Amino acid sequence: MESVVQPSVFVVDGQTDIPFRRLEQNHRRRRCGTVQVSLALVLLLGAGLATQGWFLLRLHQRLGDIVAHLPDGGKGSWEKLIQDQRSHQANPAAHLTGANASLIGIGGPLLWETRLGLAFLRGLTYHDGALVTMEPGYYYVYSKVQLSGVGCPQGLANGLPITHGLYKRTSRYPKELELLVSRRSPCGRANSSRVWWDSSFLGGVVHLEAGEEVVVRVPGNRLVRPRDGTRSYFGAFMV
């Protein structure tokens, strides 16, 4: 009779859940590692914000110390600068041009354009060639005239120069007073057949009272060339 072979059977009595416990421990370790990394990042961010706040606080304190040591006038320096700029913009000023066809007055001062092109009046008035001040003070007055002719002008051959001058009219004196005068002659470089060109510029600071007038005179006014208003001009502004 044939014998039957039975398979071997092994019986384990305890610790049947060891593999499952190991898997659970690995998951817990991973979760703890993630929490630790997140906490470290939060701590670094907090430290950075704290450092930045400390530097800003120190900067604010240093600026406060600097301002505290400034003189009283220094605290309002920017306001004073702005006020000065505004006051300069409001100062009396005028620029007149020679673009007007009536530039040359017969027997009188040169006449000027007050509105067209670059010409303007601000805080000053104009009357028959004269700039009239409305406020007393120091003014920079200036004038430029473009001169032209053919050969030596009649009357200059004897050595008399062309006179270009700024003159003041005041109620305290019966005659015009010289402020600035230039004298020049083209006869040394001109002959009877050639056209010559020349220019004269005057400028300086003078004191004027309210109501006083400043005019420009060129006795040989037929030599003045108005042109386009940029060659001959007259102006003043308070300094």
From Swiss-Prot:
Site entry: Cleavage: 81-82
Xref: SMART domains: TNF
Pfam families from the UniProt entry: TNF (PF00229)
GO cellular component, one term: extracellular space
Residue ranges annotated as Cytoplasmic topological domain: 1-37
Localisation per UniProt entry: Cell membrane
PTM field: The soluble form derives from the membrane form by proteolytic processing.
GO BP terms, alphabetized: cellular response to mechanical stimulus; immune response; positive regulation of myoblast differentiation; positive regulation of myoblast fusion; positive regulation of non-canonical NF-kappaB signal transduction; positive regulation of T cell chemotaxis; T cell chemotaxis; T cell costimulation
Keywords for this protein: Cell membrane, Cytokine, Disulfide bond, Glycoprotein, Membrane, Secreted, Signal-anchor, Transmembrane, Transmembrane helix
InterPro entries recorded: TNF, TNF_dom, Tumour_necrosis_fac-like_dom
Record: glycosylation sites: 100, 191
PROSITE patterns according to UniProt: THD_2 (PS50049)
Disulfides per UniProt: 152-187
Extracellular side: 59-239
Family: Belongs to the tumor necrosis factor family.
Described purpose of this protein according to its UniProt entry: Cytokine that binds to TNFRSF3/LTBR. Binding to the decoy receptor TNFRSF6B modulates its effects. Activates NFKB and stimulates the proliferation of T-cells. Acts as a ligand for TNFRSF14/HVEM. Upon binding to TNFRSF14/HVEM, delivers costimulatory signals to T cells, leading to T cell proliferation and IFNG production.
PANTHER family attached to this UniProt entry: TUMOR NECROSIS FACTOR FAMILY MEMBER, TUMOR NECROSIS FACTOR LIGAND SUPERFAMILY MEMBER 14
Subunit field text: Homotrimer. Interacts with TNFRSF14.
Name of this chain's protein: Tumor necrosis factor ligand superfamily member 14
Organism: Mus musculus (Mouse)
Phylogenetic placement of the source organism: Eukaryota, Metazoa, Chordata, Craniata, Vertebrata
